[in-house]
């Protein structure tokens, strides 16, 4: 399993990759633009090519993922917001594809009371439209649907919901899944023991399919199990705990899936010691199953 880190791109894409290498990350995740602004960052073809070249120069960082802005809401019942979200998703995906990223992680959004079934067709249509507009080739950058913590009317709070979205998009092979450990915990899906982790892997396989699981977001939780709130905590300092995370990370089915550390969420993000801690948790999980 690759242990990666979310890195800041305020100084540019290539410096972000360099920072990932400096802290010992095997993979990086980068926002393609400010996560709380609509205006996409404009990267020239030369800048995107420079990032792809830098990846070859830093083989220790084996994978790049991008994260879409938080403002996107494909499930919105408001036509203006839905259209704005689709355009923003397309812009984010275009940048990720130009960087050679292995996936663009997306929070689907909230139906705001209109209901999951009502929002489902629009969500699926928007996903496929963005994928087609950027790159119809199946080898292009996929969109990775992230599981939600379950707050309010968010879409994707369960793997059953994520499977329904993919099904509504005719099973498009350019759609994958990103599993966030804190969101799992907050949405009331247990995984903190070896038997519970085994059950979770079976659930994923029978809903979205393990082949669609492309990356993990590795976070502890500030809130209790089932609290339905998105609140990340540093590894080992939250209500999941290092042992709970180890139970999941050690599962054999996940060893080819990059795990992206998103904490600490303040300052410059994950540090060398945080990446080392995550590796220790992984090693403990593997030892438990040896």
List each model region and its residues:
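Residue-level preference for long, well-ordered alpha-helices that form the structural scaffold
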Residues: 40, 44-47, 78-81, 85, ...
């Amino acid at each position: 399993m690759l242990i990666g880190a979310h890195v800041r791109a305020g100084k540019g894409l290539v410096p972000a990759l360099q920072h990932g290498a400096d802290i010992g990350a095997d993979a990086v995740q980068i926002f393609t633009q400010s996560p709380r602004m609509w205006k996409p960052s404009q990267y020239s073809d030369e800048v995107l090519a420079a990032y792809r070249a830098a990846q070859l120069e830093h083989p220790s960082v084996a994978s790049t993922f991008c994260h879409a802005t938080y403002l996107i809401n494909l499930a919105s019942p408001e036509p203006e917001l839905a259209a704005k979200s689709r355009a923003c998703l397309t812009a984010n995906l275009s940048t990720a594809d130009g960087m050679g990223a292995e996936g663009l992680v997306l929070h689907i959004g909230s139906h705001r009371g209109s209901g999951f079934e009502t929002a489902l067709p629009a969500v699926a249509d928007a996903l496929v439209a963005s994928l087609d507009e950027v790159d119809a080739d199946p080898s292009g950058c996929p969109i990775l649907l992230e599981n939600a913590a379950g707050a309010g009317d968010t879409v994707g709070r369960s793997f059953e919901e994520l499977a329904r979205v993919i099904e509504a998009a005719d099973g498009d092979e350019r759609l994958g899944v990103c599993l966030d450990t804190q969101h799992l915990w907050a949405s009331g899906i247990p995984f903190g023991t070896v038997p519970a982790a085994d059950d979770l892997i079976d659930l994923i396989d029978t809903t979205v399919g393990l082949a669609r699981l492309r990356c993990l977001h590795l976070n502890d939780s500030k809130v209790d199990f089932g609290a339905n709130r998105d609140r990340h905590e540093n590894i080992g300092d939250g209500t999941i705990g290092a042992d709970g995370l180890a139970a999941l990370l050690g599962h054999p089915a996940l060893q080819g899936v990059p795990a992206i550390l998103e904490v600490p969420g303040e300052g410059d993000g994950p540090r060398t010691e945080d990446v080392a801690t995550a590796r220790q948790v992984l090693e403990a999980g593997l030892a438990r199953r040896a």
